[in-house]
Every structure is written in structure tokens, then in C-alpha cells.
Amino acid sequence: MSESLNYYVTAYYRFTKLADLPAIQKALEDKAEELNVKGLVILGDEGYNSTCAASSIESFEAWKTFIREYFNSPDQFFKDSESTKSPFRRFKVKVRNEIVTTGIPGVMPPEGVNHHLSPTEWNKVMKEETDYVMIDTRNWYEYKIGTFKGALNPNIEKFTEFPQYIEAQGIPKDKKMLIFCTGGIRCEKGILELQDKGYNNVFQLDGGILNYMKEYPNDQFEGECFVFDHRVAVDQNLQPTTKFGLCPHCGQPSTIKIECKRCDAHELICEDCIKVEYAKDTCSKNCAYQLEKHPARKGQKQLVPFEIEKMKAEGKDTGSIPQIRVTRTKYISLNKNGEAETRSTKETAE
């Protein structure tokens, strides 16, 4: 890996029966603190789903070794990349009924291969075959910023709507169907649902878009890939997007640049919120609220946690950052570790 990049990132998951989730959660949290690993782990009875990052290659590799050994999964598949931007501010474990929200808890994908296509096999189908249908299983906003050539857009808000979409299309049960998602985990359950409904000629992209772009950048996938962390999206080289931001009003990917009428900050707004009064002219919900109440009054620039992390990643001085008021009762400041922290009172973060 290049020494010029600041963060090493890996995405991984595994469907496996787990017990004593509180003990597992503590073990993960303790190890992450020891190695200074940041990230998110979704933990459940059916397994784990995670993206984590570290600023040193030693900690990065040690974390992956720990995961393999702790979960007794020597063949654990990690989708590694590098980033100039910190994907996470902290490490967090969330315990949920499903490690990926599909609406079909209790369904356990089988061990091994279930109609998986490697990136090479996927490319071969796309370039040499014509009698198939390809469907993007992700949400509409993920599709919008990037997808495979010729992929259909289900235009869904959540994955639980996907099986109903397939049935409504009247696709023949024996038609060759290719499905894909960001990292592969949604398709692991999605393909089971389709097979249960009689679609037995369905194939899924092994490792998802992230695995494909690592092997075939600038090939059959067009645009960028949305990710659920502070990078927002990654480009064809798996680097943090320079094009998209998250709309401060609704959280959707955004590209429209505005200058806040209240605090003069620059922000990216989505196509929907740019049509909404007060939202279209402001960089945050707080500024929108204040602009509506006091149209002629200017205010202090808003500074959100990931902007502080960006300043740190760029080597800028954060020691003089003031506490920033983001709502009537919430402030952002730096704690003793130099991390952004939201507090409910105006006092120094500990």
C-alpha cells in the first residue's frame, strides 16, 4: 500500500451463528481501543457486518488477524482499500436482529458458494452474453450516483421492497438474472428470497461493487459507489469522492454548491432540498431554522464533526477550534484525544 495515504480501510462480513453478543461486543471494543481502530460493526445472532479503518498498516493488519482468530474464520474475505479521508470518527458496535436490513431475519445464507460470480466471470457475462437481465439491488440514491452499464433501477427506498419489485416486472423464472450490491452482503440474502420464489437462474457478484472496482476500475461500472461512512462515495480507484457530499438537510448524496445566507459557509445540497424554502439557502438544519426566524441576522459558521476530522487529516491545526453550537442545546468541541465530540452543554469535552 502507498505510504502517502493516511488510512487503511477494510469491509467484511460473515454469516455465522453467534452467542453471548455482549461479550463479543466488549472484546471488539477493547481490541479496537488497543489498536486505535475506528469503524462500525453490526453484530447479530446471524453474524457480523463491518467496515473499519486504521491510520497505521500495523494496526490495520493486526485487526484483520484478530477478526480471523476471534471468530475462527481463517478464510475471512476482506475488501481492502486506502483513503486520504478518515471514514469514521470513532469505533462503534451495534447489536441488531439482522446484520443487513432485508426484512427476512432468521434466513441464514449457506456456507460457500451460492451462484457467486467473480469480477472476472461477471465481466465475461457482460461482454460476451446478451440474454440476461441485470438488477441493482441498492436504494435509488445509490443507483443514481453510479451503477453497472445496462442495470435496471428498482427505484426502491429499502431492500425489503426488492422481492416485490422483481415479481412486479414479470421476469420469467428461468431468465438469467444478475444482481449486485455494494459489498455483496445484501445479495447473500436477496438471492435466497428470489430462489424461494422460483427464480433459479440468479447470480450474484462476489464481493459486490467494491471488489469489482478493485480488479476492474473504469470498466463496466459507471460513476461512483455510495458507501455508508464519511467518505460518502468512492471513485473508480476506491478513493473518497471529490464530487459528492451528504445533503445537510436530508442526508442524500448532493452536488449542488451553495453559500449559506446565514453564516456564509459553502455546502453541497441535493436536488430535492434545493427546491425547498430556507433549506436551499443554508448549510445546516440549524441555519435553516435561524434564517426562517431571523432573516436579517448573520450567525457563526457551523462546523460538524467530520469537517474537524477532515482538517486533522489535512494536517491543519485543530487546537484553536472553538465550541460550535449546532442546535439550541448541542455543541461540538474536541475531547482530550483530539476527536470531535457532541455535547449537550457548553463546556470543555473531556
From Swiss-Prot:
SUPFAM superfamilies for this protein: Rhodanese/Cell cycle control phosphatase
Domain of life assignment: Bacteria
Domain Rhodanese: 128-221
Active-site feature positions: 181 (cysteine persulfide intermediate)
GO MF assignments: oxidoreductase activity, acting on paired donors, with incorporation or reduction of molecular oxygen
Uppermost EC category: oxidoreductase
Entries under InterPro entries matching the protein: Rhodanese-like_dom (IPR001763), Rhodanese-like_dom_sf (IPR036873), Rhodanese_C (IPR022111), TrhO (IPR020936), TRHO_N (IPR040503)
Protein name, per record: tRNA uridine(34) hydroxylase
Organism the protein comes from: Bdellovibrio bacteriovorus (strain ATCC 15356 / DSM 50701 / NCIMB 9529 / HD100)
Encoding gene, per UniProt annotation: trhO
